[in-house]
């Protein structure tokens, strides 16, 4: 007997329309709701840093080595954190395991990575990142640490490390124990000192062979993945320990260095911001209100002060400048910063909560509400950026094609 699939008072297609209405996508000119993000982890397998995109080998599949990397793009306000500090994709080594928060493409027609129409665990439809962070950055943000249970060494050059993650303050939240690989490439950091496995063995801290209890030693771990095992010897999802920070001073030292790396990059490329409003004058002059993007070192925001002069230029969704010599009169605006305000209420992830107003005598086309600009105080550098980081107005550079991302066919079993 056939049974009607629809309720008596429900028109066909109603539920599909309701599902479509529930789909959340970020909107240009606004920062997204963090509670709408999808969280997942993956190994960084490919990077196109100039276009702020790459590929992740997403966890959750049967075997990591059989899981093809899937493309992702950073949202314009999307943040990268490495070693507990702000970073750019170019700073993160390939192979690093990353935690991320992702959304559906804001505009599928303009997506620089392929739109996923048939999602799965290892190929999510949400492929536009608000946040990407390595393991120590995740732990520092979440207030967690790794506790080492024991190490089992073999031949002085490789071993297995048993550890679990838990809140640094203690209490509930202890996670499942993991066994991870380490070898001669694993770096150990103690204060300002870098060590290797051979150094720990020479000091008698770890054995060259056999098992030793580590009594819950508290550390921060850098985690990567690299090939381990095969179809028969299935250890292929085991993580690799790339770094061990043995004390807080060592972690702080790594964070401080990465902060300096990123700070200098932002000063040379200028601070990205959303244009919130433009008040037009009578003869081309205007006052532009813009919100600075978040995730930067506080000292960068402190450079924006009321009364100093600033300069801005048009930018794209991938944060590329429109032109290389951005300080030329025709492609950049200069003028006094007339106001700087800090949002007091809760600031959404991706935003700094800092809004500035700058007055210019001749407004450029790229400074319209909802568009992205890059802005600097005049004491920041005005160096020309490298060719891959500006578009010269070319359409395919402003809107990179998703077809240029790496593709992988199905695995054939011979």
Model-derived segments and their meaning:
Residues 2-77, 82-414:
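Short, flexible, surface-exposed loop segments at domain boundaries
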């Amino acid at each position: 007997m056939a049974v009607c699939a629809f309720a008596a008072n429900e028109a066909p297609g109603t539920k599909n329309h309701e599902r479509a209405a529930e789909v959340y996508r970020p909107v240009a000119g606004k920062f997204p709701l963090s509670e709408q993000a999808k969280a997942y982890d993956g190994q960084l397998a490919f990077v196109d840093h100039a276009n702020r995109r790459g590929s992740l080998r997403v966890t959750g599949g049967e075997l990591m080595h059989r899981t093809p990397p899937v493309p992702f793009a950073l949202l314009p306000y999307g943040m990268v954190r490495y070693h507990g500090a702000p970073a750019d994709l170019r700073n993160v080594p390939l192979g690093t395991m990353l935690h991320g928060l992702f959304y559906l493409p804001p505009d599928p027609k303009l997506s620089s990575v392929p739109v996923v129409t048939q999602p799965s665990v290892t190929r999510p439809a949400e492929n536009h990142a608000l946040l990407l962070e390595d393991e120590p950055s995740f732990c520092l943000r979440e207030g967690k640490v790794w506790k080492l249970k024991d190490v089992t060494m073999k031949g002085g050059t490789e071993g297995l490390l048993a550890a679990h993650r838990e809140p640094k303050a203690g209490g509930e939240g202890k996670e499942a124990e993991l066994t991870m690989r380490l070898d001669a490439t694993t770096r150990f950091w103690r204060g300002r000192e870098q060590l290797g496995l051979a150094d720990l063995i020479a000091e008698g801290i770890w054995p060259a062979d056999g098992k030793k209890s580590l009594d819950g030693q508290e550390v921060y771990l850098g985690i990567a993945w690299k090939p381990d095992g095969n179809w028969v010897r299935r250890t292929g999802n085991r993580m690799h320990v790339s770094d061990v920070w043995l004390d807080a001073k060592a972690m702080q030292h790594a964070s401080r260095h990465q902060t300096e790396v990123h700070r200098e990059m932002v000063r040379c490329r200028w601070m990205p911001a959303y244009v919130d409003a433009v008040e037009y004058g009578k003869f081309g002059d205007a006052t532009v209100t813009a919100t600075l993007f978040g995730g930067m070192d506080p000292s960068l925001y402190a450079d924006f002060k009321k009364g100093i002069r600033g300069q801005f230029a048009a930018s794209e969704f991938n944060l590329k400048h429109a032109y290389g010599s951005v300080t030329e009169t025709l492609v950049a605006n200069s003028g006094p910063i007339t106001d700087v305000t800090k949002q007091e209420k809760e600031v959404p992830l991706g935003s700094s909560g800092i809004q500035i107003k700058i007055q210019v005598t001749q407004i450029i086309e790229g400074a319209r509400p909802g568009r992205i600009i890059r802005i600097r105080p005049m004491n920041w550098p005005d160096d020309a950026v490298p060719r891959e980081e500006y578009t010269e107005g070319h359409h395919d550079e402003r809107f990179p094609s998703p077809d240029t991302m790496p593709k992988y066919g199905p695995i054939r079993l011979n």
